[in-house]
Amino acid sequence: MEGRGSPDNRGIDYRHVYLDPFLIISEYSLIKIDMIILRNNERLMAEIDRIAEVAGYLWTKGWAERNGGNISVNLTTLLSEEEKALPALVSSIPLQEAMTALCGHVFYVTGTGKRMRYVAKDPFANGSLIRIAADGKSYDILAEQPIPPTSELPSHLLMHNFLRAKGRDNRVVLHTHPTDIIGMTHCKPFLDSEKITRTLWSMIPECRIIVPKGVGIVPYEIPGTLADRKSV
């Protein structure tokens, strides 16, 4: 290792090194240690594995063409206070609207432009953990790479925030493109909530159990826009 004040041949600048009685650790190494801490959380990694499994289903069934669809999962209850307080890779990315019911919450979110087949293979290379700020007005990217979340993050967070504010414990928002449902929406009669709901209930009896309040229909809006978020 070269002396302090000059970068070594691995690109680590030792001007940022601090001394510990037993260790010499660079800022780069600290980030790696944070990742090790998270990877050692068995409950967290089991949930990440389930996300990968679901992403695989979306891909194999053709319900997420190209980079279509996205996933966000609230992981807050699976993390220790130490893990929730890990330093950010990217800090204070502003949100258009304060998410007051999500302050301090941590989510796994698939990345912008990422494909489900790749999420299934490596969730952390195709998504990131984000932490909502204490005031709910911004978020940090925590791990494992500074991958920007899906462009539809505002819609996801608005749904999470709404449900949380209502005392609901729903932790997952999954946006997908089921082929048959999309086909039905191209037929004008099914653009009526009651019509499509009753049709689905009659075709699949279990649907009434899983979706007891029916299926909502919202007008078309450009994905990721404020209008899209509000309509959802």
Per-segment meaning from a language model:
Residues 21-25:
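Hydrophobic alpha-helical signal peptides and transmembrane signal-/tail-anchor segments
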Residues 33-231:
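Glycine-rich flexible loops
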Residues 3-5, 11:
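Residue-identity detector for glycine
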Residues 19, 29-33:
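Intrinsically disordered, low-complexity segments enriched in serine/proline and basic residues
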Residues 6, 26-29:
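Serine residues within intrinsically disordered or low-complexity segments
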